[in-house]
Amino acid sequence: MSEGVEWALHSCVNLAWSGPDRAVSAARLAAWHDLPAAYLNKQLQALARAGILTSSPGPRGGFRLARPLAAVSLMDVVAAVEGPEEAFRCAEIRRRGPGADGPTAEGAAADCAIAHAMSRAELAWRKALAAQNLDEIRQQAERQAPEAPQRLRAWLAAQ
């Protein structure tokens, strides 16, 4: 998974902390965590295409949450940034080279055991991400750093 997922998740929480009426530019969100603005902007645009954020152009434009954090799962963000494809792709190497399963070998027609195991693991991972929403993440972040929302709002106001 790319670092863009982490950046996107933090950006969603930061947008919630900034307030519902404030649009925040990609450059300002990037500066808050010392990230490259152009790369973060790509992640934010992906979130906007997925309906997680809205974007508005212009000098007072930027990004806002399109829906409440409680309505956005971690899986929604991962899928928006990484795409919906499975992380593991079996290349069927068991069918190549001197060790290839022959057409009459027992189990050659069956699914690859490794692909099957990886698919089960990915399904569990996706279910776990889908079961947790961004509001739960926001709450945990505020328990860990209660001053963070106010620090962000003050920093944005000073810019």
Predicted segment positions?
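Conserved segment of winged-helix/HTH DNA-binding domains
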Residues: 3, 69-95, 114, 118, ...
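Beta-hairpin "wing" of winged helix-turn-helix
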Residues: 51-66
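Key DNA-contact positions within bacterial/archaeal DNA-binding proteins
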Residues: 38
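C-terminal regulatory/oligomerization modules of transcriptional regulators
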Residues: 90-159
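Alpha-helical residues within the helix-turn-helix
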Residues: 31, 48-49
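N-terminal helix-turn-helix DNA-binding core of bacterial DNA-binding proteins
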Residues: 3-5, 9-35
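Short, hydrophobic-biased segments on the C-terminal half of alpha helices
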Residues: 12, 44-45
